[in-house]
Amino acid sequence: SNKISYGIRRRYLQGYELDSVMNYPLREAVIMYILYGECEKMRSATEGIYRRYPKCVCDVLMNFLGTHDTKRILTVFGGDSGDGRTADELAHMKLEREQLKTGINRLKRAYVIVAAMFGVPSVFYGDEAGLEGYDDPFCRRPFPWKHQNNELTSFFRRIGKLRRSE
């Protein structure tokens, strides 16, 4: 890879250290495309990934939208940054009805892109169930077992089946 970290070229993907890496460049490009229509960022990111990694690495990249280190993707796509709010406020905040509707629509579009790309689509627990949350620790809430968004869960299941059938 062309990864330079702390001033040193890293050799993570040469068979001795890692089999894959988390594809943050794709995540950021998909978010920017869905939120702001930035086609150029999407093109640049995907071309850059192909340029930096051989096909055998591209085929196993971990493609994702949410992680334990980021705001919940539904919250990001719902459009409420939570900026300027106290931890107590963030602990109890939920998206408004229209924000939730917008967030779900955007999340579906984004996940179709992730699932259609080279690499391995990954879903952070709860994203498929409509879990909301802001920065840590609010992105690490427990899975909403009795309060899942069944429409969203079914959507993720359908896309997974489509991906496997390719």
Feature names for model-found ranges:
Residues 39-49, 83-108:
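Aromatic-anchored helix/helix-loop segment that forms the rim or "lid"
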Residues 21-28, 81-86, 103-106, 154:
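A broad, low-specificity signal for short, low-complexity segments enriched in glycine/proline
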Residues 12-19, 63-95, 111-150:
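Aromatic/acidic polysaccharide-binding cleft in carbohydrate-active enzymes
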Residues 1-61, 113, 130-161:
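Active-site-proximal helices and loops of the catalytic beta/alpha 8
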